[in-house]
């Protein structure tokens, strides 16, 4: 039974609950419901839970440090559980992917994402799997304001299908590994056809 740490990135508090930047938190909350566990224990400078799923032990973590300090929480959890970067899956929002689409990758830079920047600084590199949740770019205005704004009503209507799709993707990743999951899910549109 493999142990994996899955971190959903976001900002704590009700003010940020439905913002685009909290896509990682939303996926982790949905995954925990599917697994029949909760992410409510205060540990590792975050909210933490664990359970078994598809034969693996999954450790779920939502850092409560605010986005730009997420790496501290991740480093604490990895050290405590004696895990390496290859055991880590990070779920985060991505401006360069349209809403409804998801991309997976292993390694790479932070692409200007402050949560990833913090993780890479604290962990000494970026050699972990990322599940990048597309939130799209604003037509006009500041990207920082955009990711800290709530999803639009049209996006909110598509969130359940997107969250279900990402949990299916995670199940495939846990069962069958990254190459197969990438071939099945990379850039897949999870939104229902209009």
Swiss-Prot record:
Single GO term (MF): tRNA binding
Site, Stabilizes the basic form of H active site to accept a proton: residue positions: 93
InterPro entries tied to this protein: Pept_tRNA_hydro, Pept_tRNA_hydro_CS, Pept_tRNA_hydro_sf
Residue ranges that the Swiss-Prot or TrEMBL entry lists as coiled coil: none
Key word Hydrolase present: yes
Alphabetical keyword list: Cytoplasm, Hydrolase, RNA-binding, tRNA-binding
EC numbers for this chain: 3.1.1.29
Record GO cellular component, one term: cytoplasm
Subcellular location as annotated: Cytoplasm
Keyword Hydrolase included in the entry's annotation: yes
Any one GO BP annotation for this protein: protein quality control for misfolded or incompletely synthesized proteins
Residues the record marks as site: Discriminates between blocked and unblocked aminoacyl-tRNA: 11
Residues that bind tRNA: 16, 66, 68, 114
Active site: 21 (proton acceptor)
Source taxon at top rank: Bacteria
CDD domains, alphabetized: PTH (cd00462)
Catalysed reactions, semicolon-separated: an N-acyl-L-alpha-aminoacyl-tRNA + H2O = an N-acyl-L-amino acid + a tRNA + H(+)
NCBIfam families: pth
Similarity comment: Belongs to the PTH family.
Function of the protein: Hydrolyzes ribosome-free peptidyl-tRNAs (with 1 or more amino acids incorporated), which drop off the ribosome during protein synthesis, or as a result of ribosome stalling. Catalyzes the release of premature peptidyl moieties from peptidyl-tRNA molecules trapped in stalled 50S ribosomal subunits, and thus maintains levels of free tRNAs and 50S ribosomes.
Name of the featured protein: Peptidyl-tRNA hydrolase
Species in which this protein is naturally found: Geobacter metallireducens (strain ATCC 53774 / DSM 7210 / GS-15)
Gene that this polypeptide is encoded by: pth
């Amino acid at each position: 039974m493999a142990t994996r740490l899955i971190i959903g990135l976001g900002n704590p508090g009700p003010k940020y609950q439905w913002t685009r930047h909290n896509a990682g938190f939303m996926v982790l909350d949905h995954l925990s419901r599917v697994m029949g566990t909760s992410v409510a224990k205060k540990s590792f400078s975050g909210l933490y839970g664990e359970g078994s799923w598809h034969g693996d032990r999954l450790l779920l973590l939502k850092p409560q440090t605010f986005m730009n300090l997420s790496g501290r929480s991740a480093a604490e959890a990895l050290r405590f559980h004696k895990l390496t970067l290859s055991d880590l899956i990070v779920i985060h929002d991505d401006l360069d992917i349209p809403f409804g689409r998801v991309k997976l990758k292993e390694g790479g830079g932070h692409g200007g994402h402050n949560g990833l920047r913090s993780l890479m600084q604290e962990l000494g590199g970026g050699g972990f799997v990322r599940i990048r949740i597309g939130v799209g770019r604003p037509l006009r205005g500041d990207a920082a304001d955009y990711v800290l704004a709530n999803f639009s009503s049209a996006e909110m209507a598509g969130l359940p299908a997107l969250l279900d799709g990402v949990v299916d993707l995670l199940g495939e990743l846990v069962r069958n590994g990254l190459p197969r999951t990438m071939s099945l899910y990379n850039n897949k549109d999870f939104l229902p056809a209009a």
